[in-house]
Structures are given as structure tokens and as C-alpha cells.
């Protein structure tokens, strides 16, 4: 996965073979190819790790890969992860829920389906309330903002976009829904929309304990 930090890959044994099947904007690795590769290698009795960022079953196509392995009768295991939908905002000091502010959150993908259509009813989502976390939505942020405002969300609704969340190079851009289209966002970024996006409960020392243990100097 393209979101796997190199520091994690460096922990592998020297004789491990790395196969890059990351999905980059404009240069995606076809999911069918990934499924076939997993089945092919797994059928040989090899120890295959499909390393992903976040949780494999939250917009990670993990279910499709699991189904392919089941159909081919290749045994597998799943190690749950912390979804970037909650882990990345937390690393930026943003709680996706907060008493008297947001009693729930919705996680959606901003990625379009084949053919250019989107299956998300953004206008209806604007009426749900709570926090909206958008994954893979950088390139579609203009339409997302327009449709959410058409659905009733105020243009001054706080928005935070966190790039490379939990990593040393993490950056956070704070803006509003009305200005989201012109914000200098880059992929990969997790977009948080709602009143909680105005919060900044970052560690008071500037670096969280787990980051210090990992040898990271700062998350700023």
C-alpha cells in the first residue's frame, strides 16, 4: 500500500520481497490484479503480508481480497487496524465526537466510481448532523463543498485537512467549507468537516509519547 511508511518496511527481514501495488491518483493498480496476485502467491504456500494503512476493512478493499482468497480456498488471517478516519484526526488534536458538539460521525469516500458518478448523496448527508470524515476526497473537494452547502451546511463550517497523519511530516490545513475548494490540499489527506474541526487538542509538549518512543522529533 502506498500509505505504508518506509520506517515500517525497514523492519522487515532482508530476504523479504516487496511488491508495490499502491493506488496513486491517476495511476491505480487494478484491484483484480491485486486479488490475482494474492491468490497466486498464497497458493504457493508463501507467507504473504498485504500491508495496508488504516484498517483493511474500511475503504481498504479488504473484503474483496478476502473473498478472492476464500473463493480460491487460500487460508488467510486479518489483523485489524486503526482507521485513518479516527486515528488521523486524533493525531491532529481533533476528536471526531465531542459532548455537546458532535454526537456522531459519518465516514465516506470522496472517490468517484467508474464512469465518473458518485454514490454519495451529499445534500442528504448535510442534514444528518455530526462530523463528516472524507477519505480520498482531495480531488473532489470543490463538488463536495458545493453540494454540502446546497444541502444546508453553512459556508463557515470548520474544515481540517490532515496530510500524512501520524507521520513525522504530518501537516494540518484548517479552513472553512466555503473556502475548501481553494485550499492548497494535497493527497493523501483526511478531510474533517464539522464543528470539531475547529478544535486543536494536540499534545501540550508538541510531540505525543508514542511518537517520541518511535524516535520522531515532532508531528508539527
Where in this protein do the model-derived segments appear?
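Class I S-adenosyl-L-methionine
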Residues: 1-82, 179-186, 219
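A contiguous loop/helix-start segment that scaffolds small-molecule binding in enzyme catalytic cores
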Residues: 3, 33, 44-49, 61, ...
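Hydrophobic packing residues within well-ordered alpha-helices of enzyme cores
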Residues: 8, 69, 88-89, 144, ...
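Residues at the C-termini of beta-strands that transition into short coil/loop
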Residues: 22, 80-82, 100, 111, ...
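Short, flexible loop segments at the rims of nucleotide/cofactor-binding pockets, characterized by
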Residues: 25-30, 108-114
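Short alpha-helices
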Residues: 83-87, 192
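Short, glycine-/small-residue-rich phosphate/pyrophosphate-handling segment
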Residues: 89, 94-111
Amino acid at each position: 500500500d502506498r500509505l505504508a511508511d518506509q520506517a515500517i518496511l525497514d523492519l522487515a527481514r532482508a530476504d523479504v520481497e516487496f511488491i508495490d501495488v499502491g493506488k496513486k491518483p491517476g495511476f491505480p493498480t487494478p484491484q483484480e490484479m491485486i486479488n490475482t496476485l494474492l491468490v497466486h502467491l498464497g497458493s504457493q504456500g508463501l507467507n504473504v503480508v498485504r500491508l495496508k494503512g488504516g484498517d483493511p476493512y474500511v475503504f481498504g478493499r479488504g473484503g474483496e481480497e478476502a473473498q478472492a482468497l476464500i473463493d480460491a480456498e487460500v487460508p488467510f488471517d486479518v489483523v485489524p487496524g486503526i482507521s485513518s478516519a479516527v486515528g488521523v484526526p486524533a493525531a491532529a488534536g481533533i476528536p471526531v465526537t465531542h459532548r455537546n458538539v458532535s454526537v456522531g460521525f459519518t465516514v465516506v469516500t470522496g472517490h468517484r466510481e467508474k464512469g465518473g458518478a458518485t454514490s454519495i448523496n451529499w445534500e442528504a448527508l448535510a442534514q444528518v448532523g455530526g462530523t463528516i470524515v472524507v477519505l480520498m476526497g482531495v480531488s473532489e473537494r470543490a463538488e463536495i463543498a458545493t453540494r454540502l452547502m446546497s444541502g444546508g451546511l453553512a459556508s463557515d463550517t470548520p474544515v481540517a485537512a490532515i496530510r500524512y497523519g501520524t507521520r513525522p511530516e504530518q501537516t494540518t490545513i484548517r479552513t472553512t467549507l466555503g473556502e475548501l475548494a481553494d485550499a492548497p490540499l494535497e493527497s493523501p489527506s483526511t478531510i474533517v468537516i464539522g464543528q470539531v474541526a475547529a478544535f486543536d487538542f494536540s499534545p501540550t509538549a508538541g510531540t505525543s509519547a508514542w511518537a517520541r518512543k518511535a524516535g520522531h522529533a515532532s508531528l508539527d
